């Protein structure tokens, strides 16, 4: 990976980590963000298998898997936990890829002001008229954890994005 791409990708990771909500951190929640890629690795048997590893080369078109792990480091259950995460501007969200066991995932196309299902959202088209939102319009993701997180327990949410 060239130096410019390395700096650019490091900036993407830092932006994603710094944008995690302070409210979640104040509630005793510990958050960790990782950027991973699935790479093809040839095994000893000669078969090619996919292996997930930290991103080492991100070129336009590369698919990055963002994993945000949350852990309740407090002494009490953490309730009403919401994790907001921006999609870095150099990335395009992969529609339908936001996941997390026991969570409800939503997207925003207006800088995180309103959230909902992608198919229910609209943006202003080039002609100034409203049009259905598309994956490339997504600016933020939000996961609402459906149950309280017991002390010491953890979980994770993920999404995929393509490098522009």
Label the model's feature ranges:
Residues 2-7, 24-164:
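Exported/extracytosolic protein signature
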Residues 11-21:
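Bacterial N-terminal signal peptides
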């Amino acid at each position: 990976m060239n130096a410019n791409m390395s700096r650019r990708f490091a900036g993407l990771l830092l932006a994603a980590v710094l944008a995690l909500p302070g409210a979640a951190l104040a509630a005793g929640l510990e958050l960790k963000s990782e950027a991973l890629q699935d790479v093809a690795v040839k095994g000893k048997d000669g078969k090619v298998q996919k292996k997930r590893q930290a991103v080492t080369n991100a070129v336009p078109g590369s698919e990055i898997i963002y994993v945000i792990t949350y852990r309740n480091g407090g002494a009490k259950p953490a309730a009403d936990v919401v994790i907001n995460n921006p999609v870095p501007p150099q990335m395009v969200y992969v529609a339908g890829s936001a996941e997390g066991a026991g969570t409800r995932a939503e997207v925003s196309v207006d800088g995180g002001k309103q959230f909902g299902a992608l198919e229910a959202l609209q943006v202003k088209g080039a002609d100034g008229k409203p049009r259905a939102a598309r994956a490339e319009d997504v600016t933020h993701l939000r996961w609402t954890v459906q149950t309280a997180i017991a002390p010491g327990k953890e979980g994770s949410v993920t999404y995929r994005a393509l490098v522009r």
